Curated annotation (Swiss-Prot):
<feature type="transmembrane region" description="Helical">
    <location>
        <begin position="240"/>
        <end position="260"/>
    </location>
</feature>
<dbReference type="Pfam" id="PF05875">
    <property type="entry name" value="Ceramidase"/>
</dbReference>
<feature type="transmembrane region" description="Helical">
    <location>
        <begin position="206"/>
        <end position="226"/>
    </location>
</feature>
<keyword id="KW-0378">Hydrolase</keyword>
<feature type="transmembrane region" description="Helical">
    <location>
        <begin position="41"/>
        <end position="61"/>
    </location>
</feature>
<protein>
    <recommendedName>
        <fullName>Putative alkaline ceramidase dcd3A</fullName>
        <ecNumber>3.5.1.-</ecNumber>
    </recommendedName>
</protein>
<comment type="similarity">
    <text>Belongs to the alkaline ceramidase family.</text>
</comment>
<keyword id="KW-1133">Transmembrane helix</keyword>
<feature type="transmembrane region" description="Helical">
    <location>
        <begin position="172"/>
        <end position="192"/>
    </location>
</feature>
<dbReference type="InterPro" id="IPR008901">
    <property type="entry name" value="ACER"/>
</dbReference>
<keyword id="KW-0812">Transmembrane</keyword>
<feature type="transmembrane region" description="Helical">
    <location>
        <begin position="78"/>
        <end position="98"/>
    </location>
</feature>
<dbReference type="GO" id="GO:0017040">
    <property type="term" value="F:N-acylsphingosine amidohydrolase activity"/>
</dbReference>
<feature type="glycosylation site" description="N-linked (GlcNAc...) asparagine">
    <location>
        <position position="23"/>
    </location>
</feature>
<keyword id="KW-0472">Membrane</keyword>
<dbReference type="GO" id="GO:0006672">
    <property type="term" value="P:ceramide metabolic process"/>
</dbReference>
<dbReference type="GO" id="GO:0005789">
    <property type="term" value="C:endoplasmic reticulum membrane"/>
</dbReference>
Length: 288
């Protein structure tokens, strides 16, 4: 059930969804306090992801890793995915702070664009661009591969226009975003089970996938439970939508590390892994 305590500094909420948390409990300028600040945690995962891509990060192993990613033209793709994650967090914070429809779009549309970026990176794992087109990868040099960027852009535009035209219908985002996540999940399984290059030692791809998938699953469970069991601004005494923010932010960060792992593996690099406060980050070791 939705709760609107008062209008706050932004007037009557215009967003299509007003979440479980009671509005303007702590400040007339922040509609949903916990949901707003937990949104910024999403951005922090993106900021951390970019930080570990910087040339001055870490010791010799990390510096060599970043150098390799630049040589393989992977670093910029990774940074773009983390920038999009930062935008999702900022947009989500604006949405939950104001409960205005235009800020809801600032939250929802970057979610679609971030998923499309990750999908594109994932589909192009293992391919090389040649004078005759593309070599390797799941699509090879097929017509579909050449049309892929345009198809993804068209999907993003279609969803954007649909959401703008048909307002107050959150299921449009839920279905369109859910379809992208569904594909990413199962294409990841395909990449894990794909035959690895001869002589390649084990790498942490399966571990990273499980880490990201479980994080996403826990976050989604929090989202669903809150929608159905909200009572007096909480769900079983917790702000579960804030947990959704944390776990989905962490999942997206780790999934990007998974993609880096597969991109390196396709170029015959061994991959190592380190943790900071339980958060994994991978690094290239050497070619085999």
């Amino acid at each position: 059930m939705d709760y609107i305590e008062n209008q706050g500094a932004y007037g009557t909420p215009t967003a299509s969804i007003d979440w479980c948390e009671l509005n303007y409990t702590y400040s007339p300028y922040i509609a949903e306090f916990y949901n707003t600040f937990s949104s910024l945690i999403i951005s922090l995962f993106g900021i951390y992801g970019i930080w570990i891509m910087m040339p001055n990060f870490g010791t010799g192993v990390e510096k060599e890793h970043i150098k390799i990613l630049k040589q393989l033209d992977v670093r910029n793709k990774v940074i773009l995915s983390y920038i999009s994650l930062i935008v999702v967090g900022v947009g989500s914070a604006f949405y939950h702070a104001t409960l205005l429809y235009q800020n809801q779009l600032f939250d929802e549309l970057p979610m679609i664009y971030t998923a499309l970026i990750m999908l594109y990176i994932m589909v192009t794992v293992g391919e090389e661009k040649t004078k005759k087109g593309f070599k390797g990868g799941v699509l090879g040099n097929s017509l579909l591969r050449h049309l892929l960027p345009y198809l993804l852009i068209a999907y993003g535009l279609f969803v954007t226009i649909t959401i703008l035209v048909i307002q107050d219908q959150p299921k449009i985002l839920q279905v369109s975003f859910g379809a992208l996540v569904f594909y990413v999940v199962f294409h990841s399984i395909y990449l894990i089970n794909k035959k690895k290059p001869d002589g390649m030692p084990s790498n942490p791809d399966s571990y990273l996938y499980k880490y990201a998938f479980v994080s996403m699953l826990v976050g989604f469970t929090c989202w669903v439970v809150e929608r159905y069991f909200c009572k007096n601004g909480k769900t079983f005494g917790f702000q579960l939508h804030a947990f959704w923010h944390f776990f989905t932010g962490m999942s997206t960060y780790v999934w990007t590390q998974f993609l880096i792992c597969k991109l390196l593996e396709a170029k015959h690099y061994c991959v190592g892994i380190k943790h900071t406060l339980g958060l994994p980050r991978i690094h290239a070791i050497k070619r085999f």
